[in-house]
Amino acid sequence: MKITVVLVLLATFLGCVMIHESEASTTTTSTSASATTTTSASATTTTSASATTTTSASATTTTASPSSSSKKKTVTHYKRKVKRPKKVRKITRRRGLRSRNGRSSRNRRSEE
């Protein structure tokens, strides 16, 4: 039931849009606009697997502006380095051996 209501509303909306588009196409309005944009980007990521990992990335963006008679190029270089710490090793408990205070687990209980 809910789906049919949604479909009816969608069909009504599309019908109104199509009628509006057909009315807009019959009027004689002429608009001309042109724009040219050239964008070039490259990214490089290098990761080394040593004790300290360094990641570097660079990107280059070139944009041409069509508004002036001579084309101007803007080149932007980005370079970023991230230094990551060494991997932390998990400390495991030594079970069954001596505890920190020097007594074994058998001697902890009081003698009866």
UniProtKB/Swiss-Prot annotation:
For this UniProt entry, which residues form the secretion signal?
1-24
Q: Where does the source fall among the domains of life?
A: Eukaryota
Known tissue expression = Salivary gland specific.
Q: Where in the cell is it found?
A: Secreted
Compositional bias, Low complexity, is annotated for 24-69
Sequence ranges of the sequence repeats: 31-38, 39-46, 47-54, 55-62
Positions with biased composition (Basic residues): 70-112
Tell me which GO cellular component terms the UniProt record holds.
Answer: extracellular region
Instruction: Spell out the InterPro entries in the cross-references.
Output: Ng_1-3-like
- Looking at the record, which segments are called 4 X 8 AA tandem repeats of T-S-A-S-A-T-T-T? 31-62
Q: Mostly located where?
A: secreted
Q: Which Pfam families match?
A: New_glue (PF21827)
Annotated region (Disordered), positions in chain: 24-112
Q: Which UniProt keywords apply?
A: Repeat, Secreted, Signal
| Family designation | To NG-1, also to SGS-3.
Q: What is this protein called?
A: Protein new-glue 2
Organism field: Drosophila melanogaster
Point out the gene that encodes the protein: ng2
